């Protein structure tokens, strides 16, 4: 993942990382991560920071080394690219460009994608995403749905990976579900 970064980006990240590596041991504490990221123009929420820390600090020792930090920043930058993709996707759905996706617009795009949905299915999709209850989907609601779907896919991929690793570590023998839970 970090191999997708330019030399300039790596230098910038190294400089920011070094500012917070107080004793020069090549590690920063997880508490300092938020400060480093804000100094690089990122603005993660506390929940996002905790997710990042959980992803990066695999051994739970409370420190993050520079290679782990580079991977984190590369992922974060990829997510920024994804934000642009989300904006473009929203524009595709929002045919009249009024800032909302109506049931008619959703039905039209889904039909063009080859998804023949009933009125009830379209209404259900709108209801699931429509947090403020106005009968249409604004950009924030759209992002929440899309990000929830992305998280769901990542969780499923992680589960498949863990299950695959468990099966391999058990010499191909089937692992009972309750044993799998014990392992996890």
Curated annotation (Swiss-Prot):
Residues reported to bind Ca(2+) 2: 57, 59, 61, 63, 68
Matching InterPro entries: CALM/Myosin/TropC-like (IPR050230), EF-hand-dom_pair (IPR011992), EF_Hand_1_Ca_BS (IPR018247), EF_hand_dom (IPR002048)
Pfam families: EF-hand_7 (PF13499)
Residue stretches of biased makeup (Basic residues): 171-184
Modified residues (N6,N6,N6-trimethyllysine): 116
Annotated GO MF terms: calcium ion binding
GO cellular component: myosin II complex
Binding site for Ca(2+) 1: 21, 23, 25, 27, 32
Compositionally biased spans, kind Low complexity: 161-170
Alphabetic keyword roster: Calcium, Metal-binding, Methylation, Repeat
Amino-acid positions noted as binding Ca(2+) 3 in the UniProt annotation, renumbered to this chain: 94, 96, 98, 105
SUPFAM superfamilies assigned to the protein according to its UniProt record, in alphabetical order: EF-hand
Residues binding Ca(2+) 4, per UniProt: 130, 132, 134, 136, 141
Region (Disordered): 156-184
EF-hand domain residues: 8-43, 44-79, 81-116, 117-152
Note, other: This protein has four functional calcium-binding sites.
Family: Belongs to the calmodulin family.
Record function comment: Calmodulin mediates the control of a large number of enzymes, ion channels and other proteins by Ca(2+). Among the enzymes to be stimulated by the calmodulin-Ca(2+) complex are a number of protein kinases and phosphatases.
Name of the protein in its database record: Calmodulin-related protein
The species this protein was found in: Petunia hybrida
């Amino acid at each position: 993942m970090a191999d997708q970064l330019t030399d300039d980006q790596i230098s910038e990240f190294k400089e920011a990382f070094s500012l917070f590596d107080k004793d020069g041991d090549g590690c920063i504490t997880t508490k300092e991560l938020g400060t480093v990221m804000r100094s690089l123009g990122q603005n993660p929420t506390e929940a996002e920071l905790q997710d990042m820390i959980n992803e990066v600090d695999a051994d739970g020792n409370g420190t993050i080394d520079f290679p782990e930090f580079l991977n984190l920043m590369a992922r974060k930058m990829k997510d920024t690219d994804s934000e642009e993709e989300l904006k473009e996707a929203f524009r595709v759905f929002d045919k009249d460009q009024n800032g909302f996706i109506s049931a008619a617009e959703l039905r039209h795009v889904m039909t063009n994608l080859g998804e023949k949905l009933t009125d009830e299915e379209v209404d259900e999709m709108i209801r699931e995403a429509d947090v403020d209850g106005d009968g249409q989907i604004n950009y924030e609601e759209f992002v929440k749905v899309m990000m929830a779907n992305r998280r769901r896919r990542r969780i499923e991929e992680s589960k498949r990976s863990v299950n695959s690793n468990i099966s391999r570590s058990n010499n191909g023998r089937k692992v009972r579900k309750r044993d799998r839970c014990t392992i996890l």
